[in-house]
Amino acid sequence: ELNKKIKKLERQVADCEASIEETESAIAIVEAKMATPEGASDMQLYERHQKLKQQLDGIVEEWERVSMELEETKN
């Protein structure tokens, strides 16, 4: 039973880490577009950037929560 819970939490941690990587990549792409002259005046890019940053914050919070729960379960 405990092993099942640990495996589930490890899977959640891995999923969060994959989501963090994907979101960071998306942010980098948007930031590169924002650095161009035409991108600098594109408000949609700024809105997308803001949404991605908020999404990243949420995923990191989830990752921290699940990671702590995993550590507590292992100990």
What are the functions of these language-model segments?
Residues 1-75:
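Charged, heptad-repeat coiled-coil alpha-helices that serve as long linker/dimerization "arms"
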